[in-house]
Design a protein with these regions (language model features):
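Ligand-binding clefts of soluble mixed alpha/beta catalytic domains
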Residues: 1-405
Length: 405
């Protein structure tokens, strides 16, 4: 099986098992012998609790092997799926990855691709471009060159625990943040750069699900998952955030959620995201940086999300429904006889936002633990993560939850 190389090594000091298909040797075609080598890597990873990195560059399978080839693919899929949630799995696609091989690669926790790589389940090779895979949310990181793609895989490994029994990795040196102080109205990326250690945010799926920003960052040296929800959260963004939170939960990585969103665009996907947050037992700290109304608050920040700590900026707005609808529902009679109904309506909405929808009101009712100023966000989040680092939760015995998929 010279068309594939397997072994182990250290990535930034972290042990890992690896396999790499060689597209220049028989096209890297999958065979029974190659499958046995790869399956052995997965079995060793399971025994030792070590991450697996697979480098894909193969034209497909050896058709001459017929049923043996099908069985070989099936064994790899089964072993890989059984390893899911036990050790991190990263696929690095540098060349063709077509048909069943694509199923194996896409089943990893994260998929990193170079610009010229191909990834599709269609054996004809159609719709296989890296850009298409990124647009569909299958590719998490797309880089121009093979070298850049491999470097991103290295950064991912450094951000992740070795297995599901280890805690979140922490840097030897405490990180610092030199970003400008936060101010009201800051966008998601500005908030993230202001709470994360300098140059540590590694974004995933940037061009999929535009109303959710996800990725890993260091906060005072501790690795954590970051989710920033904004605007109206569409279906792709719900799926993107849900899968990311599920990964963090599987490996006990703390999740910091930043919320500035008005609502959901898809009930089905909103249910998926809500179930994910509610079920996750990892450390969860939420900061409402802007708007958080009704279902969004309940699903991502409130008791329904099972958040450990929920904080809000003093300028934030928390309400069962949008302030515009709530103000008219409660105070519409105050517009009777108004000579300027449009202007007076705006005043009523603003009054509702600064009174009943204010975070101080939510804190008084026990729905928020702390009201903070923007420039306190990094320090407050880090302190909460530190205090919650010993969190332990017991769950009911069951095979798994039946969430919307």
């Amino acid at each position: 099986a010279a068309e594939a190389v397997t072994g182990f090594g250290y990535i930034n000091g972290c042990p890992a098992y690896l396999f790499a298909q060689d597209g220049e040797t028989d096209g890297g075609a999958m065979s029974k012998a190659q499958a046995n080598k790869i399956r052995k890597i997965y079995e060793l990873a399971l025994k030792t609790g070590t991450p697996v990195v697979g480098i894909y560059d193969s034209i497909g399978g050896r058709l001459a092997e017929g049923g043996d080839m099908l069985a070989a693919y099936g064994e790899i899929l089964r072993t890989s799926n059984n390893l899911s949630g036990v050790v991190p799995q990263i696929s690095v696609v540098l060349g063709p990855c077509i048909g069943t091989s694509a199923l194996i690669a896409a089943g990893a926790d994260f998929v990193v691709m170079s610009e010229k790589a191909e990834l599709t389940v269609e054996t004809s090779g159609e719709n296989s471009s890296a850009e298409e895979a990124e647009k569909l949310g299958i590719c998490h990181i797309l880089e121009k060159t093979e070298e850049d793609a491999i470097q991103k895989a290295r950064e991912l490994i450094a951000a992740l625990p070795q297995n599901n029994l280890e805690g979140a990795p922490a840097a030897d040196l405490l990180g610092d943040c030199s970003a400008e102080p936060l101010a009201e109205g800051a966008d998601a990326y500005t908030v993230i750069s202001s709470i994360a250690d300098d140059h540590t945010f590694l974004e995933l799926s940037r061009n999929f699900g535009a109303s959710a920003v996800t990725g890993f960052a260091r906060l005072r040296g501790l690795s954590a998952g970051i989710v920033a929800l904004k605007d109206t959260i569409d279906a792709d963004s719900c799926s993107k955030a849900a899968r990311f939170v599920r990964f963090c939960d599987a490996f006990s990585l703390p999740v910091v959620t930043l919320v500035n969103a008005k609502g959901f665009a898809s009930l089905r996907e909103a249910s998926k995201l809500s179930s994910t947050y509610s079920e996750a037992t990892t450390v969860k700290v939420t900061v409402v940086t802007g708007e958080s109304y009704g279902p969004v608050y309940i699903a991502t920040a409130g008791r329904g999300a099972n958040a450990d700590i929920t904080m809000a900026w003093a300028s934030a707005s928390v309400s069962p429904i949008s302030p515009a609808a709530a103000a008219m529902f409660q105070w519409n009679d105050r517009l009777a006889g108004s000579t300027d109904p449009v202007g007076d309506r705006k005043k009523l909405i603003e009054e509702y936002k600064t009174t009943q929808a204010s975070p101080l009101s939510a804190a008084a009712d026990g729905y928020i633990e702390d009201v903070i100023s923007p420039d306190e966000t990094r320090d407050k989040v880090i302190r909460q993560l530190d205090m919650l680092s010993g969190k332990r939760v017991s769950t009911l015995p069951k095979k798994h939850s039946n969430i919307q998929l």
